[in-house]
């Protein structure tokens, strides 16, 4: 009993000290100073935000008082708040006029511009006047998780890990990635300066009150605080991007919350508001299989790696950024003054024709803070596969997406074959077990694939397209070295759709000779390639020597330099690795009439040799990228990115936005089909754009 009495007296003494301190503080603040302070806050548009934050603090304190988990200091503060509330109620009539001018009374103060002196122990208030004379619209469109600390005064500080110590990353849901900072108690304001001709801009407020005006400041803040649950690409400074924009869906006949079955870190939903059909069954793959480095016998996986500590921002020290710049400079006219292209704050504003080299597994840079790791992090946006009115299945975004944002990759099975000048009409079947591929009757002219014909009623998501030049080098003012050998093309195929990738060549090596020998062993029956699981490799055959069925053809003109590629039929079992079986040694070509048709990006302007053709087949295995439709005015562009290997034949095919995309908009890209190239295969384009070319294949 005596201990309880002593403790109660001690607590009452603390209350008295707190009350006395508050009284002294109130005496030091004059009415004129208070009115001037609130005028500044009103002009800066901070009143609403301060009261919203105050309400969050009060709710937490309220809950702690109810469940008995409050600390002694929090009990004291609760009593002080109650006393002040009673006093405020008594003085309401007297101060009504003054309070009405200031709009509302607030508790928190903005952090001072100089914040490099004190430690960051208090995480609540704001007192920064960097947007004085402006109007702010606070964009808090989701439930904010407030700090667990009570309402305490804020002092100048040096930002560090303690600024975000109260954020629990495990509680963050898989939602709009641009909404994650708001869920972590950041505030997003739309700021417009009064009487200024400048347009509105976006301003972020960190939980400790620090203002973040652009992506550079965001990166600095995340680096100083050691934040590993937010990236600079989670922040958008575009006024066109609205965090509260969401897609409103009508009555769904068929729906699926995640067609990836938890393969992707973010669910890929499916919605059909038109009929009761579903997409054809396929195996969902997060990335293409097999990895490029395994096809290359694990040789020359990475040319260089870095050990940056600044987030890989300095091209003079980052080896990976230098690889991108060096490849780009080989095809750039230095007199044009075009600087190296690449990621800027984890966004890509325009395509890099020579490819991007991301930091790899051998690099020692921080995976979260590194600005040169984007595609390898996988799908981050909330995408939905939906049934369109006229084009079959398509893909749309469920939230606003900023310009230059990575959307997804095009994943599938990598198929290999050899284009041998001695083989005029046949190709090795992709299945070693002897599955017959249906022979295709149609043929095309030089450099065109022999494709099976499609009815005009088929959707864009099912059409076949030949994509010769994914990037317009002329639009970038580049001087392109045309490749002499153009027999080999790399293609993507989704259903019946094929996408040509610009090939990257290098001279024949010992590795390629070993690969040739392996293919000969497969042909002779010494080993086979199965397509049952990812872990399986070449295994001894169960039967004697088998011949491969020639279900696909290379069509060759009379000119030996002009060779056409064969089309892998959708009905064939084409979801495994397949190789060629050359009967004579490939020859290097330095001149070809095909140069006039297709500009190629090569690793060097010197002579190049024929190598294997690599096909990315998404007909039976793939990801959400296989559902992307064509548009003559697309909102996506294609970019080659080297992630798991620097071998030129195996880039990842990534899609990035070329503008701000609003929630519910279908995501499309241009197949780049040149009208008249394959007139027999052309069908009507249904993109509906004003610049529509009316024909695709």
Curated annotation (Swiss-Prot):
Domain of life: Eukaryota
Region described as Disordered: 438-461, 529-605
Residues involved in Zn(2+) 4 binding: 632, 685, 687, 692
UniProt subcellular location: Nucleus; Chromosome
SMART domains documented for this protein: MBD, PreSET, SET
Amino-acid positions noted as binding Zn(2+) 3 in the UniProt annotation, renumbered to this chain: 312, 359, 365, 370
GO molecular function: DNA binding; histone H3K9 methyltransferase activity; histone H3K9 monomethyltransferase activity; zinc ion binding
SET domain boundaries: 381-672
Sequence ranges assigned to domain Pre-SET in this UniProt record: 304-378
The protein's name in its UniProt record: Histone-lysine N-methyltransferase SETDB2
Organism of this sequence: Xenopus tropicalis
Gene: setdb2
